[in-house]
């Protein structure tokens, strides 16, 4: 999961990557998500975005890349939205979002009764999101548990302390988190596997064919009793009703992976 130095006073340092990802999606979707508008509307966040926009506008190639990345992020978000909603509709009642950042799915997805959503990230990021949404009067659509984890603390322990039940099936989301260095990635997936009861599901995005010899997350899951499906992201424009050559070029090596634990 993301690790940044605690104690820094700069908002750009503390939540910059999350803010910029949220802004990228909003720029493509027209910012029709009121919660995204809330998270992006604070003065210091606006300052971060304005500086970023000024830099992007100065470099045509950077502007084109920004559009490609934003388009992919928006399509990826819709894909995972549908996957999580379907899994919950089929009976799973707890979801864990890893490196949640400014994710608002606990608030905006149509969760069924009895649903619990755990969000794991740095305490600073989660506090920023909670304060912004609370001030706006937003209410979660599920039982919402922000799980703040410092860099020196095992995240599974914090998850258990927050009420997670490893004996029940779980929906895991690791959006934008992989790939990681081999040892780190293997350890993360191994921990998820150990915390997952039969019937659990996981969704994440990955990069295929870029680094020979890199740890194969889908293959690892398959070898341990997970039924795995890989969707090449270049096919997403067709799935979502969009046709964009720029998005196709950016997503040439990207894939969306979903898996269900059978054994």
Swiss-Prot record:
This protein's name: Putative S-adenosyl-L-methionine-dependent methyltransferase Mjls_0079
Coiled coil: none
Residues that bind S-adenosyl-L-methionine: 121, 150-151
Native source species: Mycobacterium sp. (strain JLS)
NCBIfam families: mthyl_TIGR00027
Lineage, top ranks: Bacteria, Bacillati, Actinomycetota, Actinomycetes, Mycobacteriales
Cited function: Exhibits S-adenosyl-L-methionine-dependent methyltransferase activity.
Pfam families on file: LCM
Keywords in alphabetical order: Methyltransferase, S-adenosyl-L-methionine, Transferase
InterPro entries per UniProt: Ppm1/Ppm2/Tcmp (IPR007213), SAM-dependent_MTases_sf (IPR029063), SAM_mthyl_Trfase_ML2640-like (IPR011610)
């Amino acid at each position: 999961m993301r690790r940044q130095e605690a104690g820094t006073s700069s908002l750009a340092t503390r939540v910059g990557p999350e803010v910029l990802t949220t802004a990228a999606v909003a720029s493509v979707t027209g910012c029709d998500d009121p919660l995204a508008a809330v998270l992006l509307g604070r003065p210091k966040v606006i300052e971060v975005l304005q500086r970023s926009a000024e830099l992007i506008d100065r470099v045509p190639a950077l502007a084109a890349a920004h559009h490609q990345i934003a388009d992919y992020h928006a399509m990826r978000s819709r894909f995972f939205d549908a996957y999580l909603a379907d899994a919950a509709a089929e009976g799973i009642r707890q979801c864990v979002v890893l490196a949640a950042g400014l994710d608002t799915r606990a608030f905006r997805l149509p969760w069924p009764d009895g649903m619990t959503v755990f969000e794991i990230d740095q305490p600073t990021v989660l506090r920023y999101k909670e304060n912004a949404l609370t001030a706006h009067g937003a209410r979660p659509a599920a039982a919402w548990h922000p799980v703040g984890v410092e860099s020196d603390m095992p995240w599974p322990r914090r998850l258990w302390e927050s009420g997670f039940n490893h004996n029940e099936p779980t929906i895991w989301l690791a959006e934008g988190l992989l790939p990681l260095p081999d040892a780190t990635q293997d350890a993360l997936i191994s921990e998820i596997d150990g915390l997952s009861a039969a019937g659990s599901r996981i969704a994440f995005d990955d990069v295929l064919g870029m680094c020979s010899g890199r740890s194969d997350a889908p293959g690892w899951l398959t070898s341990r009793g997970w039924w795995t499906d890989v969707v090449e992201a270049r096919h997403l424009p067709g799935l979502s009703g969009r046709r964009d050559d720029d998005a196709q070029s950016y997503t040439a090596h990207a894939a969306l992976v979903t898996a269900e634990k059978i054994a």
